[in-house]
Each structure stands twice: as C-alpha cells, then as structure tokens.
C-alpha cells in the first residue's frame, strides 16, 4: 500500500509543481477556545448536568424536534390554506404533516432532487407558472440520502435559496469533486491539516472525512469550506441559519445505514440511522432481530457514554455537516464496479488494490463513537461496540430515505418521493427503492415498537410494465393507516438526466439543465392542466381522513387517475429507454397532456449521457487524487 500511495502522491505533486498556490488564510484561534471551535476537529467541553444522554425511541419525538415541528406548523398552516384556495379546494380540518424524500446518486441525485424541490418553490417563476410553486412552504420534514444528503446540507446551510441561485453564485461543481482544476496542493494540504487535527485527538479518521470535506468545499457556504474554516456542525444549523432558527424551512434528516462486523454486502434489513440538528440515533436496532432503538443529542456526538452516562470527558464538533454528508454518501464500495469500465489498465490495478486495502481496514466506512454502549444490553445488539460503522444507506437498496418519514410517531400524512436512482441499464429508476422499503416494512412490523407505515407498491417489473417509473403515481390512496406517497421519478422531459453516479463534475449549463429537468419531473412541464389540483389533493388527503367513499368529486377524480390500482405485471419488461424531450406515453394514452409546445421554458434536446468512457476516466482520476490524499494522511 505504501508503494501505491507514494506513486499517487508523486503523480499528484508533479501536476502541481509548476504552480505555487497562494497560502490559504487561517483564522487565528481564540485563546480560550480549543482547536475544534475554529476547525474540523472536535473540541473538549465540560459535561453538562441537564442532558438526557440516551432517549428510548418508544418515548416519541425528542424535545428539540417537537419544538421545531410545533413552530413549523404555525407557518405551514397559512401556506397550505393559500395553496388549496388557489386550486379552489377546501382547507383541511387539521394541518397535514408533509415530508419530502430525496434519493441518492451523487451529483445526479443532488441536482435532480433539488430540481424537484425547485418545482415546489414559489421563488421559481416556472414553478409558479406551473402552479405547484409554493408547496415547499407547506412541508414539515425533509430527508436526504447520499447525493440527496448533499442537496439537504447545501440547501439548508444556505438558508433555502433557489437552487439555480446556488449554482450561479456558490457551487463550484464544474471543478472535479476530488481532483480540482487548480490549487490541488493547497486542497490536499488543507485536508491533511483538518483531518490530522481530528486524528491527533484520538478520533478515527477514514476516507469519509476526506470525502465529506471535499463535498463541503463544493456546496456548503463559502465561510465553511475547506479553504476557510470547515467547522459548520449539524447541531449548529438552527443558530447559524436564520431560516432554520425560525422554522422557515422543513426539518432536515440525513440517513445512513449500519454495516455490521464482517459484512461486505449490506443487508436490506440493516439498521437505518438518522442525523437531525437535534439527535443521532435509530428507531429500530439490529438486522436479524429488530428491537426498539434510541437517540442521543447530536451536539455531543463523539463523547464516550456508558449506560447513559458520560465517562468524564465530553466533546462537541464531531457532528460536522460535511462529515454527516460524507457518511450518508460512502460510495466507495460501488467504485469496484465502476472501475471495470475504466480505460486505463494501470489506473484500474492501482485503485483496485488501494480500495481492497481500504475495505479490509474498514476505512471505507464511517465510524461513529457508540453512545449506546452498555445501554439496554438485553435487547440492544450494539451494546458492546466501540464504534457504530455506517455506510451509504443506498447500499441497502432503499435509495429513497422514506423510513424516517414512515415512523408512526412523526404522523406524516404525505411524502413526495423524488427518485433519481440508477436502477436500469440506462440509469433510470424502476421503483426498486419503494419496493425494498415495502418488503423491509414487513420485517419491522413483526415488532410493534419498530413498525413503519409503508403502503403496498408493485414489484420492480410491475413499476416498469405499468409505466409508474415514468410519471407521478400515488400509493396508499385508500389505506388510511399509511401516508400517501407521491412518487416522482426522474424522466427526460427536457434533458438527458441519466448521468453516472460517479460523474464528479458538471459544467454550469449542464447542471442548470439537470435542475430544470428535475423540476419538470414534478411540474410535468406544465403539460397537464389538472396536475396542480391533483397534487394538492394528494398532499392533503389524509388530513381530511378521506377514502373513496367520502372524497370530494374533484379529488376522487384525481385519485382515480393517479393512484396505483393494485395491478402488478411481473413479466420481464423490455429495456426502459425514455426519449429526451418527450411526454410519458401514459399521459398521452390517458388524454392528460396538452403537449410540450404549450409548456414554458426551454425544451432543447441534449445528446448523450455522462456515462461515456471520458466520464469513467474522470472517475478514475478523481479516485487517484482521493486515494493519493488519503495515503498522505492515514
């Protein structure tokens, strides 16, 4: 491994030898504060006496989340009233709890998911013209996974700005995520400085730290990027971001999955862990056997806790937002598969050897100090672990983070599920994420205290054969025990959005088209006049306690059109190859679409996708740079 590292390091330094980057300014540390207050490293604090270190999941919502949702409801209610009135619909008798869930898939998922969010923002002219803009103001929860967690972190930390504004003024995603166009030496020097400071304190440092810092330096606010002070913690967001401090945005949840000792392939029933600005934990522990989970204050994550009490030394700063985003997106197990298509044999051999060593050393996961050590040892399967080992939750095939929004305690009424998964040969979704969550829900239902409320959905073949993976579909329409899931799959309304998960850079015009196409997957490109009304009906249906017997005529007509009817054609479908700049055939067959010509915005076709040999070579170069930097640090 040292030979590989040396070769990578020399090649990296050779590319920067003729350009001496300017010194990166570092903020002077205040004398009374530890290093971690100003940098990526955690810092030591006095242990507080008024903290509940472990909260059993069966006790309901934590106090921080409960207070946030109560404050959020006061803003959500008038927003929903306004949106319903605009459609000529009745105001719900109670405020519905609405969630959005953004799938994983690297930058593709980040851009497509944020495009979908943009379709719900009244700040977007096109979304407002499409009459879906404004609904984000009625959303209470937002969950993100992998690339969807990048979308979550960037959107929340930047105060809910329009994604196209972030692209224009902040993001530097035209520079390779881990192999920047310039300043490579300063980039890796800063990585070394920040991660070494964390390591010196005795905390584990792995590839996730580097990956997360790289992500943060492309999408987080500039003051918290690697070249400045990368010290934005998840727990500090409500105090740092005014729009979160006053509950003007949905409460963010970022999701990861546990990889148990000895596992190479993550079980679909693996423990799902969630990070919020208030807590870290899981609603259900274990994979083979499920038991009620628990939560700990995320502000003190990294503190050694034994049976609910700290061991004398407490820490803050472990919950760096970049680290949480990196934890949710540990894509490197999948790098083995992607390398099979890399053009350079030498490159493939070098990176494969390095990644193999990482896998053996458990450096390809994220290690979280176990706050639940010796807690509830009779039922807690992680009571004897020093670290909780987390990976990208998409590795469980639950690539849409629905589970946190299906927990009965949160009382979610409707979920808008944005799916940009790489399920098919041509990198389009086929419903795998929803079906996997449905199958997992059956396992969780075996224990009353771990169940989630997931409606039935068709098989993957049924999704494709029914066309459900090409247009919005409502699931759980007449099952009043579950939320209504409004499934929004990515579709090439105006752009070839089926780019590779491992495409590590996007030109700004390409990223802009990705955002617009994601928005049009939700708005249907303003081509279906009844869609805004039907979208409103689905979002609020549960708060009326409607069924097919008492729904309004307007909303029942919508549900007759958009609800899954229970069919499941399990025969092997033909390859799914949607046409760019087209209307989904189902919309045409059902006489719902007025055609693309009447839709606002540019619908110019873009040829090709980013899964070409050149893109794969870019993947390889990014991995070279990343592994080179890691080798210098570990």
UniProtKB/Swiss-Prot annotation:
Function: Exhibits phospholipase B (PLB), lysophospholipase (LPL) and lysophospholipase/transacylase (LPTA) activities.
Subcellular location: Secreted
A GO molecular-function annotation: lysophospholipase activity
SUPFAM superfamilies: FabD/lysophospholipase-like
Species this chain originates from: Cryptococcus neoformans var. neoformans serotype D (strain JEC21 / ATCC MYA-565) (Filobasidiella neoformans)
Residues in PLA2c domain copies: 46-569
EC number(s) reported in the record: 3.1.1.5
Keyword terms: Glycoprotein, Hydrolase, Lipid degradation, Lipid metabolism, Secreted, Signal
Gene Ontology terms: biological process: glycerophospholipid catabolic process
Signal peptide stretch: 1-19
GO cellular component: cytosol; extracellular region
PTM notes: N-glycosylated.
Record protein name field: Phospholipase B
């Amino acid at each position: 491994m040292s030979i590989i590292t040396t070769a990578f390091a020399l090649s990296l330094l050779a590319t920067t030898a003729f350009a001496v980057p300017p010194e990166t300014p570092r903020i002077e540390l205040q004398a009374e504060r530890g290093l971690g207050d100003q940098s990526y490293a955690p810092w030591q604090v006095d242990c507080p006496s008024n903290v509940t270190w472990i909260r059993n999941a069966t006790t309901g919502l934590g106090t921080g989340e409960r207070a946030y949702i109560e404050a959020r409801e006061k803003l959500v209610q008038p927003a929903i009233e306004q949106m319903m009135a605009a459609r000529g619909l009745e105001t719900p008798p109670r405020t519905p709890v609405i969630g959005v869930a953004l799938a994983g898939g690297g930058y593709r998922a980040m851009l497509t998911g944020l495009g979908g969010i943009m379709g719900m923002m009244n700040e977007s002219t096109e979304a407002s013209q499409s009459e879906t803009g404004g609904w984000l103001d009625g959303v209470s929860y937002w969950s993100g996974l992998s690339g969807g967690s990048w979308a979550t972190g960037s959107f929340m930390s930047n105060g809910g700005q329009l994604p196209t504004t972030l692209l224009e003024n902040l993001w530097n995603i035209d520079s390779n995520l881990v192999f920047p166009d310039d300043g490579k030496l300063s980039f890796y020097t800063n990585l070394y400085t920040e991660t070494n400071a964390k390591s010196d304190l005795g905390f584990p440092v792995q590839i996730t730290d580097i990956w997360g810092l790289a992500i943060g330096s492309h999408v987080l606010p500039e003051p918290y990027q690697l070249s400045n002070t990368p010290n934005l913690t998840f727990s500090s967001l409500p105090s740092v971001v005014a729009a979160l401090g006053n509950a003007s945005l949905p409460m963010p949840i970022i999701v990861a999955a546990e990889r148990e000792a000895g596992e190479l392939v993550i079980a679909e029933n693996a423990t799902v862990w969630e990070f919020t600005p208030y807590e870290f934990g899981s609603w259900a522990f274990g994979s083979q056997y499920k038991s009620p989970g628990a939560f700990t204050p995320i502000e003190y994550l990294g503190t050694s806790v034994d049976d609910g009490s700290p061991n004398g030394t407490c820490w803050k700063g472990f919950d760096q937002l970049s680290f949480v985003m990196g934890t949710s997106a540990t894509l490197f197990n999948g790098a083995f598969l992607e390398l099979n298509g890399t053009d350079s044999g030498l490159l493939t051999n070098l990176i494969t050897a390095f990644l193999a060593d990482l896998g053996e050393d458990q450096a390809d996961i994220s290690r979280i100090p176990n706050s639940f050590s010796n807690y509830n040892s009779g039922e807690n399967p992680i009571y004897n672990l020093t670290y909780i080992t987390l990976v990208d939750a998409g590795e469980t095939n639950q690539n849409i983070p629905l589970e946190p929004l299906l927990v009965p305690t949160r009382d979610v009424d409707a979920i808008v599920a944005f799916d940009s998964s790489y399920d098919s040969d041509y990198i389009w979704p086929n419903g795998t994420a929803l079906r996997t969550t449905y199958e997992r829900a059956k396992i969780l239902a075996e224990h009353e205290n771990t169940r989630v409320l997931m409606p039935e959905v068709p098989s993957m073949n049924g999704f494709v054969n029914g066309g459900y993976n090409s247009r919005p579909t409502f699931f759980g329409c007449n099952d009043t025990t579950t939320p209504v899931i409004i499934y929004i799959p990515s579709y090439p309304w105006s752009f070839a959005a089926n780019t590779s998960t491992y495409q590590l850079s996007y030109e700004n015009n390409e990223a802009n088209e990705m955002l617009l196409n994601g928005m049009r997957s939700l708005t249907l490109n303003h081509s279906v006049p009844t869609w805004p009304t039907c979208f409103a009906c689905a979002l609020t249906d549960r708060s009326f306690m409607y069924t097919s017997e008492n729904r309004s005529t307007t909303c029942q007509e919508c549900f007759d059109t958009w609800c899954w009817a229970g069919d499941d054609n399990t025969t092997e479908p033909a390859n799914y190859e949607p046409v760019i700049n087209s209307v989904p055939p189902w919309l045409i067959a059902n006489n719902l679409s007025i055609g693309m010509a009447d839709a606002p915005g540019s619908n110019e076709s873009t040829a090709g996708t980013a899964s070409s040999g050149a893109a794969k070579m870019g993947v390889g170069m990014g991995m070279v740079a990343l592994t080179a930097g890691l080798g210098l640090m570990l």
